[in-house]
Amino acid sequence: MASYYSNDFRPGLKIMFEGEPYAVESSEFVKPGKGQAFARVKMRRLLTGGRVEKTFKSTDSLEGADVNDMNLTYLYNDGEFWHFMNNETYEQLQADAKAVGDNGKWLIDQAECIVTLWNGQPIAVTPPNFVELEIVDTDPGLKGDTAGTGGKPATLSTGAVVKVPLFVQVGEIIKVDTRSGEYVSRVK
């Protein structure tokens, strides 16, 4: 694998640090008037999802992580594992709850997901940026109930709870941003 100096760190770069794969989320290169230049780096552990902030000297280098992202189609959840399929080879992979994490609430049948593999094992699952889900439970919106600018909680078909505008009703399909968990729009 390639080696990267700390001033080469960019968001999205996957590196090996302390024997585990990390993804760089942000990197700020600092060159003080006095002393050696350094980089302040925010990274996410790919195995657990935890975030770490580290400072590296400009001369420090780290190996690139041998991880690869694959576009796979989500098939189903059997209660213990989430099953995905490669559309080119029809090979199936299963990811455990640790790899899926909180993203399980955004997975719908036939959704194109990015599965990150390390040593052939899934370590992270990224759902599509936007999903369309049906509202299965929410409070009814009363006519003239517009005093608050907020919204109301709505339970979606996958079990996720999202704050929606007051005019949205049960049975409607809405578009949700999976990165922030926020309501985007109604789907016509």
Curated annotation (Swiss-Prot):
Pfam families: EFP, EFP_N, Elong-fact-P_C
In-chain residues carrying the UniProt-annotated modification N6-(3,6-diaminohexanoyl)-5-hydroxylysine: 34
Compartments reported by the entry: Cytoplasm
Domain of life per record: Bacteria
SUPFAM superfamilies linked to this entry: Nucleic acid-binding proteins (SSF50249), Translation proteins SH3-like domain (SSF50104)
Predominant location: cytoplasm
Gene Ontology CC entries for this record: cytoplasm
Record keyword Transmembrane present: no
Record PTM text: May be beta-lysylated on the epsilon-amino group of Lys-34 by the combined action of EpmA and EpmB, and then hydroxylated on the C5 position of the same residue by EpmC (if this protein is present). Lysylation is critical for the stimulatory effect of EF-P on peptide-bond formation. The lysylation moiety may extend toward the peptidyltransferase center and stabilize the terminal 3-CCA end of the tRNA. Hydroxylation of the C5 position on Lys-34 may allow additional potential stabilizing hydrogen-bond interactions with the P-tRNA.
InterPro entries registered for this protein in UniProt: Elong-fact-P_C (IPR015365), NA-bd_OB-fold (IPR012340), Rib_uL2_dom2 (IPR014722), Transl_elong_fac_P/YeiP (IPR020599), Transl_elong_KOW-like (IPR013185), Transl_elong_P/YeiP_cen (IPR001059), Transl_elong_P/YeiP_CS (IPR013852), Transl_elongation_fac_P (IPR011768)
Keyword Protein biosynthesis in record: yes
SMART domains to which the protein is assigned, alphabetical: EFP, Elong-fact-P_C
This protein's UniProt keywords: Cytoplasm, Elongation factor, Hydroxylation, Protein biosynthesis
A Gene Ontology molecular function term of the record: translation elongation factor activity
Pathway in which this enzyme or protein is active: Protein biosynthesis; polypeptide chain elongation
UniProt record, GO biological process: peptide biosynthetic process
Family: Belongs to the elongation factor P family.
Biological role: Involved in peptide bond synthesis. Alleviates ribosome stalling that occurs when 3 or more consecutive Pro residues or the sequence PPG is present in a protein, possibly by augmenting the peptidyl transferase activity of the ribosome. Modification of Lys-34 is required for alleviation.
UniProt-recorded name of the protein: Elongation factor P
Organism: Yersinia pestis
